[in-house]
Design a protein with these regions (language model features):
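Re-entrant/interfacial helical elements at transmembrane boundaries that shape
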Residues: 88-98, 241-256
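Membrane-interface alpha-helices at helix entry/exit sites of multi-pass transporters
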Residues: 66-70, 84, 88-89, 98-115, ...
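Hydrophobic alpha-helical membrane segments of integral membrane proteins
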Residues: 91-95, 107-111, 122-123, 239-241
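Transmembrane alpha-helical cores of Major Facilitator Superfamily
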Residues: 77, 112-115, 233, 274
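Hydrophobic transmembrane-helix microenvironments that flank and shape a buried ionizable site
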Residues: 3, 48, 86, 110-111, ...
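Predominantly cytoplasmic-facing regulatory/coupling regions of multi-pass membrane proteins
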Residues: 1-73, 130-236, 262-325
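Transmembrane alpha-helix interface/packing and boundary motifs in multi-pass membrane proteins
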Residues: 76-83, 229-244, 248
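Hydrophobic alpha-helical transmembrane segments of ABC transporter permease domains
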Residues: 111-131
């Protein structure tokens, strides 16, 4: 159903706007834009991997930063290439959990790491949308009130008395409280988690601005920033096809509401999608190396087992067969 939702959004956009704006936007992609997007993606990937490494260490399933960077590139490629936009993160959590001997903690570390990044992104988006004019500026007081209520509720769950029941909900709540305190709010790591998340959001916005300029958008940066923030928030909706769907729909609506043209918004979103996919291609190399390595290890184990079996047979003493008189 989620994939169908993303396909429906794209179908509506193409029916109403045609594919001319999309094709024209893709034709503007140049070598410098790809290189710039790849450079920004390297910085954001390192910061994201650092955030994951800090959260995982707090939960007791530490991952070295070098390995975290490679795994994060791989998950970004899978997120960009597969429907839903989260399968790469699920794979990253499962793989790390198996390597660490605790799949549950591995998955939770990835989940909390992504949640921390999205929380910082929401806070920055609220600040930008409150300060700068945008098509949703008039709705921001109500949005801010809802956000404050959500924050107060989360603080109450974290700082309140832990439940003592034995139900599944009580156990899950106790685990979540312990994870947040150890993985996200630990005094030694919380500042680094927030700072790395800020750099990641800034990198995504920079990539969006690169895509906008590449697609021919000439609006001032201060006008583009609120639009970029809203499009980035739309990308967190898992109803997409490899990242495509809600991003293009929201971009087309926002650019039209801002007087920049829906076709321009569709072109910018399409260019952004291509730049992000191209910048994640190192993850494809990591995936291929991992797959080849696992295949070689499997062949080595099979050959070793066969050799041990032959050696065992060779060690069995030969018993002469008696001949009947």
């Amino acid at each position: 159903m989620r994939v169908l939702g993303g396909a429906a959004i794209l179908a509506i956009l193409f029916c109403r706007l045609g594919i001319g704006a999309l094709v024209d936007g893709l034709r503007t992609i140049s070598g410098w834009s790809l290189v710039a997007a790849a450079a920004v993606a390297f910085v954001t990937t390192v910061c994201s991997a650092l955030r994951w490494s800090l959260v995982a260490r707090g939960l007791g399933v530490a991952v070295p930063l070098r390995g975290a960077i490679a795994a994060y590139y791989r998950s970004q490629f899978l997120n960009s290439a597969l429907p839903g936009g989260v399968l790469g993160d699920v794979h990253r959590g499962l793989q790390h959990g198996r390597d660490a001997g605790d799949v549950s903690r591995g998955l939770r570390a990835v989940g909390w790491e992504r949640l921390a990044g999205q929380a910082v992104q929401v806070v920055l988006a609220l600040i930008v949308l409150l300060v700068l004019p945008s098509p949703v500026h008039s709705s921001m007081p109500a949005v801010l009130a809802i956000a404050v209520l959500c924050v107060l509720g989360a603080v109450g769950l974290i700082r309140g008395r832990p439940p003592r029941g034995t139900s599944r909900w009580d156990r899950a709540l106790r685990t979540a409280r312990a994870d947040v305190r150890a993985g996200l709010l630990a005094p030694r790591t919380r500042a680094a988690i927030v700072l790395s998340s800020v750099v990641v959001v800034a990198g995504h916005m920079t990539t969006f601005l690169i895509a906008a300029r590449t697609a021919g958008a000439t609006a001032p940066v201060l006008q583009m920033l609120p639009l970029a923030m809203l499009v980035l928030l739309a990308m967190t909706v898992p109803t997409n096809i490899g990242g495509w769907g809600p991003r293009e729909g929201v971009a087309a609506w926002l650019f039209a509401a801002a007087g920049l043209g829906a076709g321009q918004g569709l072109a910018v979103a399409a260019v952004y999608g291509v730049l992000v996919l191209a910048a994640s291609l190192p993850g494809a190399a990591v995936l291929a190396i991992t797959w080849l390595g696992s295949g070689n290890r499997g062949s080595t184990r099979a050959a070793g087992s066969q050799s041990e079996g032959l050696a065992g047979k060779a060690d069995v003493p030969h018993q002469p067969v008696p001949v009947a008189a």
